[in-house]
């Protein structure tokens, strides 16, 4: 994944941290949750460039496709993931989490696009919703439910241009409410108390990762050189740690990372991405 679908890999690592921490707070299985996160989008390996997190500013391949074809490709990552996981003899308990992380949810972005196109063509917005709906089942375990929640929330938080703790918290709560109201959590045993703990935990983890750092007055490389360091690549750990910032290359300064993120968010179009996520 890290080579073929780096955006998906990064997304999987981040939600791995989120679900592990949350599982710990609600007495679910943290290791199962984390490993489930690592494999949940394995199927994206087949067509990585059709998934927004791997496009990195390149053209959006869906621009040339009908909404139903886009939906078919997006939905197929579940089936492809199950096949790949079985081929590589991943334990069944992890394979089960692959279809459950989307449950019976609808790919709202392409469903709405199809409705709009149908209305423009013949005045009727009638579209077969089943073409835009994942096959399920809904999450059957608390770990799979955590994965479903973290999946949507992490993707949504990436679209915030200036992710302050308040904004992250607001989005986490909004997403959890949305998934709860959709009925996707009806077949698992999460309680309302669990959902409250999960929201707090996800907010803490995501704030630690995505909250903007204060920009340095001058590039970190220069500060380091003044302090007697040599190459920028040897800059101090606080400024370059990829563990602190899984979305960035380890050789980037904190300021560059921060700027990159803002550019990235701008390029992708935060509003468009939120629409894609059904918000
Ligand atoms: Fe997925
Ligand atoms: Fe995902």
Q: Which stretches of residues belong to each language-model region?
A:
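Divalent metal-dependent catalytic cores for phosphoryl transfer on phosphate-bearing substrates
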Residues: 2-165, 169-172, 178-182, 191-192
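Long, low-complexity, intrinsically disordered segments
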Residues: 238-279
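Long, hydrophobic alpha-helical segments that serve as membrane-spanning/inserting helices
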Residues: 180, 184-239, 247, 271
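Intrinsically disordered, low-complexity linkers and terminal tails enriched in Pro/Gly
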Residues: 59-63, 115-127, 223-243, 247
